[in-house]
């Protein structure tokens, strides 16, 4: 694992010449447990269950019209670079509910745990505050415990659960909705 300081990282908005870098951050990640949500007295809480064996999962590369994320008022994609290598990204949109919705956040495997995700979230938060949005939201599958732990560490709270959205996937029991409200 490399060591990275914030001074070494450049966060760049998407430009046409950077489109080829978008999928470079889509590495596999470990699925080692799941979040089990509970709703009581109007509040969400959760427990963690660890799996006996971890497995590697990789999402397919998104096939989008990336030009739409360049110089747009209501969506953006930011790429994180170290020594001209793309090591992370965050893709965001202004949602109907006045939240900045994170469509995707990813850090290359070798750079996880070094603050890249935090830097990208800070960039998204700045973008959202410039637009006077209420906060940031995202969704994660219940079996992506590593990501859910990261979101909690970054100040997100569980705001909802959908048990039908991923019905086609027998591995996923629930989609979890996470929120970070601005004060």
Specify the residue positions occupied by each region the protein language model found:
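Acetyl-CoA-dependent GNAT
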Residues: 16-17, 24-99, 103, 108-109, ...
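Short coil/turn segments at alpha/beta junctions that flank glycine-rich nucleotide-binding fingerprints
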Residues: 114, 130-134
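Extreme N-terminal starter segment of soluble prokaryotic enzymes
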Residues: 7-10
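Residue-level signal for alpha-helix termini/capping positions
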Residues: 71, 129-130
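C-terminal "cap" of GNAT-fold acetyltransferases
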Residues: 3, 134, 141-148, 154-157, ...
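Conserved acetyl-CoA-binding loop-helix of GNAT-fold acetyltransferases
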Residues: 107, 113-126, 149-153
């Amino acid at each position: 694992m490399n060591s990275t300081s914030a001074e070494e990282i450049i966060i760049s908005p998407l430009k046409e010449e950077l489109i080829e870098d978008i999928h470079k951050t889509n590495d596999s990640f470990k699925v080692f447990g799941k979040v089990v949500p509970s709703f009581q007295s109007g509040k969400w809480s959760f427990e963690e269950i660890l799996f006996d064996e971890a497995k590697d999962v990789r999402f397919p590369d998104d096939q989008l019209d990336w030009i739409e994320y360049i110089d747009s008022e209501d969506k953006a994609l930011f790429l994180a670079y170290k020594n001209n290598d793309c090591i992370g990204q965050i893709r965001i949109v202004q949602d109907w509910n006045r939240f900045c919705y994170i469509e995707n956040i990813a850090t290359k495997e070798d750079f996880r745990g070094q603050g890249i995700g935090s830097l990208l979230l800070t960039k998204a938060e700045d973008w959202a505050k410039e637009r006077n949005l209420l906060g940031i939201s995202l969704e994660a599958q219940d079996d992506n415990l590593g990501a859910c732990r990261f979101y909690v560490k970054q100040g997100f709270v569980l705001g909802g659960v959908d048990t039908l959205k991923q019905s086609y996937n027998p591995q996923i029991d629930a989609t979890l909705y996470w929120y970070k409200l601005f004060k």
